[in-house]
């Protein structure tokens, strides 16, 4: 009996050893990760804005969580204007608490789009890109995805109302976009998915209405980012009026049923500069006829604004053929597409990655007029000075080599020496000591050369 038990015990030990050896050599298969969960990540951004009313100070730091889409590289694609004044970027995956540091490889505020990189290879384990759709639907149900701070993978149904042209964030560029309705409180780059492909990234919400940058635009951004030199998005730089007034149409020489819009402004740093003129009637962009309200018929999406025709599928430096009506004569002209940066404008609409420049002299605080300055001037229920709004409307977008910027007396510091002047603010400075002022550099020079 004892010999039998010993034999059984020895056999059991041998069996356990074999099983243990097999367990080491052949690990249990990993649980498959849902492709959607594997392609959507959370991006945590910590940033700090400058105080444009007291330009030597900063505001309190802020934190924001947005959604990122894994794309080939591997990299993370985000549609958000939160990059530029950021201090720290961290990413999370698969609903876990662990955070990895990330950095911006490329950010274009005219998207607004950004590509992030994560150097730690362990972050990419279990993640995979989700294909970007080549086209987007004009109707039907889609899904919107994101990770919640609780670690839950959140999904909501959205109904596509239409595909239309829209601007996103701070951008002045008009893109093809998805217009949807959904109960999700989105607007932070949530991923829109249909038939297993990414259809877009949500950038804004109004009520139950969501606007997403469409996948073809995202594909164009990634293609541009892969080039040795990033060229960005082209923009027309045109303003126009609709041609629905019969008397005006007849005066300009438009035929019955003929479309076209009348150009009211051609910016000197835009794509139409040197070729188009205010008063021209834009009849055609490429092969697309323009109707009397500035729309054209897209082969897939129907009636869209003609503005994206200068941007999508084309890059800065490309030549674009236009049909115009000038002095009752129909002409074919070619323009070279240009990227229009905010710093090229006399009043930059936004400032990214740097604080305000300023000059303090005798307790007087001077700044250059910018979009953030106007925003700060409207805080606390106040309204910006009408003179500033008029200046921005008339001159803000038009570069002037002689006066590249508008300098303003922003405020007066409280001091006994400044009694009686303490209420002066938001005044445009044109001359100091007889010198024309077109920048803070001019102002410094004028103060250094008293009359």
Feature annotation, model-predicted:
Residues 27-30, 50-80, 98-101, 127-128, ...:
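A conserved glycine-rich beta-strand in the N-terminal activation segment of trypsin-fold
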Residues 72-154, 177, 181-182, 186, ...:
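Conserved active-site neighborhood of the chymotrypsin/trypsin-like protease fold
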Residues 106, 125-175, 202-212, 222-232, ...:
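Flexible, gly/ser-rich surface segments that form the specificity/activation loops bordering the active-site cleft
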Residues 39-44, 119-128, 154-207, 212, ...:
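Active-site region of chymotrypsin-like
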Residues 27-35, 43, 124, 198-256, ...:
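C-terminal cap/linker of serine protease catalytic domains
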Residues 59, 181-191, 241-291, 381-438:
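PDZ/PDZ-like domain segments forming the peptide/carboxylate-binding groove
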Residues 82, 216, 284-323, 431-451:
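PDZ domains, with a preference for the canonical peptide-binding region formed by the helix
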Residues 43, 68, 74, 78, ...:
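Terminal peptide-recognition signature
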């Amino acid at each position: 009996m004892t010999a039998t038990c010993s034999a059984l015990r020895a056999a059991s030990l041998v069996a356990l050893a074999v099983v243990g050896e097999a367990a080491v050599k052949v690990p249990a298969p990993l649980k498959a990760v849902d492709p959607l969960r594997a392609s959507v990540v959370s991006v945590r951004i910590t940033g700090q804005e400058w105080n444009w009313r007291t330009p030597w100070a900063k505001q309190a730091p802020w934190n924001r969580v947005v959604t990122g889409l894994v794309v080939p590289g591997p990299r993370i694609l985000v549609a958000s204007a939160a990059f530029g004044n950021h201090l720290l970027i961290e990413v999370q995956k698969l609903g876990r608490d662990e955070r990895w540091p990330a950095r911006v490889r490329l950010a274009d505020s005219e998207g607004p789009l950004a590509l992030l990189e994560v150097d730690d290879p362990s972050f990419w384990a279990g993640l995979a890109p989700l294909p970007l759709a080549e086209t987007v639907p004009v109707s039907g149900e889609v899904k919107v995805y994101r990770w919640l701070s609780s670690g839950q993978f959140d999904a909501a149904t959205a109904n596509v109302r239409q595909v239309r042209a829209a601007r996103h964030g701070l951008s002045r560029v008009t893109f093809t976009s998805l217009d949807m309705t959904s109960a999700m409180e989105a607007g932070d780059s949530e991923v829109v998915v249909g038939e297993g492909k990414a259809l877009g990234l949500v950038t804004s919400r109004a009520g139950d209405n969501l606007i997403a940058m469409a996948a073809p635009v995202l594909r164009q951004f990634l293609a541009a980012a892969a080039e040795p030199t990033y060229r960005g998005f082209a923009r027309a730089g045109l303003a126009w009026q609709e041609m629905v007034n019969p008397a005006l149409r007849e005066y300009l020489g438009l035929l019955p049923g003929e479309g076209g819009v009348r150009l009211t402004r051609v910016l000197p740093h835009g794509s139409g500069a040197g070729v188009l003129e205010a008063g021209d009637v834009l009849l055609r962009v490429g092969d697309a006829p323009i109707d009397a309200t500035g729309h054209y018929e897209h082969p897939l999406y129907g009636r869209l604004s003609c503005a994206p025709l200068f941007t999508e599928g084309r890059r800065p430096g490309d030549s674009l053929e236009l049909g115009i009506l000038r002095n009752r004569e129909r002409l074919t002209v070619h323009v070279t597409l240009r990227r229009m940066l905010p710093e090229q404008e006399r009043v930059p609409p936004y400032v990214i990655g740097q604080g305000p420049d300023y000059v303090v002299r005798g307790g007087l605080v001077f700044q250059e007029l910018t979009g953030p300055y106007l925003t700060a001037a409207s805080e606390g229920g106040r309204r910006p000075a009408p003179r500033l709004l008029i200046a921005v409307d008339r001159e803000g977008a038009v570069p002037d080599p002689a006066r590249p910027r508008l300098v303003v007396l922003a405020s007066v510091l409280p001091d006994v020496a400044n009694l009686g002047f303490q209420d002066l603010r938001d005044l445009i400075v044109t001359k100091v000591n007889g010198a024309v002022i077109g920048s803070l550099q001019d102002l410094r020079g004028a103060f250094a050369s008293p009359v």
